[in-house]
Amino acid sequence: MQLTLASTSPAREKVLNAAGVIPRKVSPGVDEEAAVADLVNPTPAQYVQHLATAKARAVDGELVLGGDSMLLIDGELQGKPHTREETVRRWRQQRGKRAELVTGHALFDAATGQIYEEVVATQIQFAEVSERAIEAYAATGEPLECAGAFTLEALGGWFIESIDGHPSAVIGLSLPALRRGLDYFGYDFSDLWG
């Protein structure tokens, strides 16, 4: 069985690779602003799940996995910062605070035409870090294309005090959620091992 990852995220691909899965990787090409335009006052979970589902439905494949992650902090849902300046601003806001990384998962099974959806929320305690560390981290470029402006598995690990949840969910997709989705369709995760 071939899993198609409806994402260009290197982090999501690495999570799958480390778990023995070599997915076919396809950019979903979803206009995220247009995809959520019809939502009225969505919760953070509804927002990320809607995007994850749109991505899974946009790609052809036997079994397609879509995902989307955003950071909920101080009542604000944040995606990727994209710029060094925005990264610094966000880190000034989030250092020393607790936040929630909300990740939507959508697994589309072509054989049944059904989709399994699950949102996973992971609590993150950010470290109280210096202005110098924030500036240096932003300058590396690493956090610019990451939800919440951080990574767990690389330089961003220095900025995390603790997490409450599965580490794979923080990196990009929850392996437990994927396992539950596979179970839902009657597959075993070992079917994906390449």
UniProtKB/Swiss-Prot annotation:
It is found in: Cytoplasm. Its cofactor is a divalent metal cation. Disulfide bonds: none annotated. GO terms for cellular component: cytoplasm. Transmembrane segments: none annotated. Its EC number is 3.6.1.9. One of its GO terms (molecular function) is nucleoside triphosphate diphosphatase activity. InterPro entries: ITPase-like_fam, Maf-like. Pfam families: Maf. It catalyses: a ribonucleoside 5'-triphosphate + H2O = a ribonucleoside 5'-phosphate + diphosphate + H(+); a 2'-deoxyribonucleoside 5'-triphosphate + H2O = a 2'-deoxyribonucleoside 5'-phosphate + diphosphate + H(+). GO terms for biological process: nucleotide metabolic process. The active site is at residue 68. Nucleoside triphosphate pyrophosphatase. May have a dual role in cell division arrest and in preventing the incorporation of modified nucleotides into cellular nucleic acids. This is Nucleoside triphosphate pyrophosphatase.
